[in-house]
Amino acid sequence: MGAYLSQPNTVKCSGDGVGAPRLPLPYGFSAMQGWRVSMEDAHNCIPELDNETAMFSVYDGHGGEEVALYCAKYLPDIIKDQKAYKEGKLQKALQDAFLAIDAKLTTDEVIKELAQIAGRPTEDEDDKEKVADEDDVDNEEAALLHEEATMTIEELLTRYGQNCQKGPPHTKSGTGIGDEPEPQGLNGEAGPEDPSRETPSQENGPTAKGHTGPSSNSDHGTEAGQIGEPGTATGEAGPSCSSASDKLPRVAKSKFFEDSEDESDEVEEEEDDIEECSEDEDGYSSEEAENEEDEDDTEEAEEDDDEEMMVPGMEGKEEPGSDSGTTAVVALIRGKQLIVANAGDSRCVVSEAGKALDMSYDHKPEDEVELARIKNAGGKVTMDGRVNGGLNLSRAIGDHFYKRNKNLPPQEQMISALPDIKVLTLTDDHEFMVIACDGIWNVMSSQEVVDFIQSKISQRDENGELRLLSSIVEELLDQCLAPDTSGDGTGCDNMTCIIICFKPRNTVELQPESGKRKLEEALSTEGAEENGNSDKKKAKRD
């Protein structure tokens, strides 16, 4: 089913917290893989980033989970390490931290760690020894070729078991080793046809059809079931191909000298004809030359377009942090200040008296500001809203495949890690905050999510206890999950969501009837004590 499972994985990772004593912020979160073949989201719920600051964040990975997990592990400390953070400048600290962690992804040490997170193979000592052994084999083959190049034809034929006096063989052996292929000129060009030497293709045996994948130990060989060009082989040949190619020179060498004189005469005649033709048709030749130049220009332009439209993985090399990345939306709460940094299309929304207040802006390539930066960096946005036909968002941590313009700073690359910052002073009207990846926002609008949570957040069970926030998130994820994958992908993505309340929650609330009943029980107990039944109360306490 391509990028989707046959059945959704609805197992959820959920949790709740009450915040820190100095900054009580009840929160609940849940994450679900859904229809995707893997889970690429990550998040942070840190009630005490320091003594007066809380941090909540969501990372939506793409091309792999490694960058999202790396950010969840290291970004909190990188934020705290920023000079601006220590000076109390949280907005500047967030911007600097996003760019700092993005730059770290290009270092060799971090690339290795990302590869380990992703489970991709890394080069170890065994690999290096294997490469050294292959180099030794190559050196031995080169020495053998050099030795054979200095030998006479008779010595070569003797070495390979042929008698020079027998002349060129014309047998119909089933192996095809002694069969003469169609004559070829120098550098593999076809020579003049000789009707006296017709060789049925059925008599050339299996080696005349080239080699197939199973007989090739080269990554560049043909795939299994595909047949190569007759008499040719690309890459390193396997055992069956190498045995044939080793024996082919014994026939081609002896026959080459027999045909060389006739071929040279024919070539000279053809050259004379070409010279006469060019003298008579100078105008036509110049016109052809102009057409060829136009064709060359067109081909070069097409090659340039192909380079611009390349997407990660097309170069045959996959590198974590280059062909993978993550969105990041980070919220810091210090006192009454809420500071939100966002790069990508994850989102933070605050409920203000029941109305959705967006605290982040989705970064899409077709947006005016984003499109201008992409074009200035040498990129394009396709009709379906993708940068160079690949990524469908314009800001992210990682994705260094799109950040290779050496003439521009990091924040001006096609894909930028520089976050937008929004600040809000919290009041009594601000009830809760929602941070989630686009797996939620592609299904429901900001207001729809706020309304959904608002309708659940005050619900209590039969014992009078408020619902856990994580249970509300779980219900939201189920609400967003698509019934199948037959649509446009909406509801089929990974989903991660966090709800943070700005005020403490009363976990138990006395209902009028239950309060009256408890008051009556207390009065009856006091009356019993006055009547000398204190032993019963003591027994209960014991």
UniProtKB/Swiss-Prot annotation:
PROSITE patterns: PPM_1, PPM_2. The keyword Phosphoprotein applies. Its cofactor is Mg(2+); Mn(2+). Its EC number is 3.1.3.16. It catalyses: O-phospho-L-seryl-[protein] + H2O = L-seryl-[protein] + phosphate; O-phospho-L-threonyl-[protein] + H2O = L-threonyl-[protein] + phosphate. The modification Phosphothreonine is found at residue 122. It is a lipid-anchor. Binds 2 magnesium or manganese ions per subunit. Its main location: cytoplasm. Residues 123-139, 259-309 have a biased composition (Acidic residues). It is an enzyme of class 3 (hydrolase). Belongs to the PP2C family. This is Protein phosphatase 1G. It comes from Rattus norvegicus (Rat).
